Amino acid sequence: MENNLINEAIDKIKSLKVDIPIIAIVLGSGLGNFIHWIENPTFVNFEEIPGFQPSTAPSHGGKLIFGTFKGVNLCLMQGRLHLYEGYSANQVTFPIRVMRRLGAKNLFITTVSYTHLRAHETVL
């Protein structure tokens, strides 16, 4: 059943005639503006894709964005799901599995973190 749902999601995305992504990027909080650098973007709301769950965080877009950046085909995930929102691990990871099956060879998961370091201190 899981494979059928993944195939349905892929069929829906391919019906939109998007370029097959080489890289998938999950945009962390505060990084949503990266989409403005994408050339020829195609926006797909999670609700339009079989098996995708809605993003409940107000600042998360709940979209996949397909396009290019410096000549590389990308799939950006703007908004992500969390276990603490009540989603299962299977639901949280479903979009990642879809992006992989679409053709993404590399996955970058980003996040934003904050600190209370004094000026000129570095965290590695």
Region annotations inferred by a language model:
Residues 2-118:
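Metabolite-binding pocket within alpha/beta catalytic cores that recognizes anionic/polar moieties
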Residues 116, 123-124:
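Single conserved hydrophobic/aromatic residue that forms the stacking wall/gate
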